[in-house]
Design a protein with these regions (language model features):
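Active-site beta->alpha N-cap acidic-glycine motif
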Residues: 1-59, 66, 81, 88, ...
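Metal-dependent polysaccharide deacetylase catalytic core of the NodB/CE4 family, i.e.
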Residues: 27-113, 117, 121, 128-146, ...
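Catalytic-core region of carbohydrate-active enzymes that cleave or remodel glycosidic bonds
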Residues: 118-125, 185-192
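A conserved mid-domain beta-alpha-beta active-site/ligand-binding segment of alpha/beta enzyme cores
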Residues: 143-186, 192
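Short, glycine/charged-rich beta-strand-loop motifs at protein surfaces that mediate ligand recognition
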Residues: 173-176, 205-209
Length: 257
């Protein structure tokens, strides 16, 4: 069977995250869910009871206090969002959280230091077209978003996110495909042959708004048929796997941080 590692990230803490968790449970897959306490953009966020229920089945990470884009606030507010978001989430769950996700994928180097200082073990970005865990554990990248992006969005993100040599083969594998969903399948097939990690991410609100539940369910079933149980990880597991077996998910010539 495949040696590829699969992980799924779900952002924003919408109550419909619980529906994604049900699909994951049916296919015996693992995932990491990143929850703010509130969402300043007005989207609903699951209650404390719902968050505790979700934590029985999946890893829960922080997404700041108010789903705050850190690059849009001063350093004092950024620190408050990071540190208090962690504290309040842990109080709701009754246990520590290790993971953090930068809202909107927006952060500067000083925010990475704040996340470390707050006591997180890793942080995730929305940088895409990666087949490994990136350069260090506080800028964990992804492979693709489960969303009908047009081709020009992929190209624009490729240009803006750098690391071109590292991401070029993934872009080549999918860029000729017009159908966004087929791009995800094609990238999976490509990484199964040439990569180490397939890291999918999504928002439950997008899945609901675009009525993509059937497509998500079918793709996750496809993954479950291809990926053995030991290669189905949440992001904390991915970081542990990265530390334990550097050769699996991190190039030999680079430093593990």
């Amino acid at each position: 069977m495949s040696s590829l590692v699969f992980t799924l990230s779900v952002d924003d803490g919408h109550p419909l995250d619980l529906r994604i968790a049900e699909i994951l449970a049916r296919h015996r897959l693992r995932a990491s869910f990143y929850l703010p306490i509130r969402n300043a953009e007005g989207a609903p966020v699951m209650t404390a009871a719902q968050a505790r229920e979700l934590s029985r089945y999946a890893e829960i990470g922080s997404h700041t206090l108010d789903h705050c884009f850190l690059t849009r606030v001063d350093d004092n507010e950024a620190w408050r969002q990071i540190s208090e978001g962690k504290t309040e989430l842990e109080q709701r769950l009754g246990h520590a959280v290790s993971g953090f996700c930068y809202p909107g994928g927006q952060f500067h180097a000083r925010h990475v230091h704040m996340v470390r200082r707050a006591g997180f073990g890793y942080a995730r970005t929305i940088n895409n077209l990666y087949s490994d865990t990136g350069e260090q554990r506080f800028t964990l990248p992804t492979s693709l978003q489960f969303y009908p992006h047009k081709r020009d969005v992929l190209i624009r993100n490729f240009i803006s996110q750098g690391a071109y040599k590292r991401r070029w083969s993934a872009l080549q594998a999918i860029i000729a495909e017009d159908n966004w969903l087929m791009r995800i399948y094609r990238l999976f097939d490509h990484l199964e042959q040439h990569g180490q990690v397939f890291h999918l991410w999504c928002h439950a609100l997008d899945i609901e708004r675009l009525q993509l539940w059937k497509e998500l369910d079918y793709f996750l079933g496809f993954v479950a048929r291809r990926i053995p149980p030991g290669r189905r990880l949440d992001n904390s597991g991915l970081i542990r796997d990265r530390r334990r077996d550097v050769a699996l998910v991190f190039p030999d010539h680079q430093k593990v941080v």
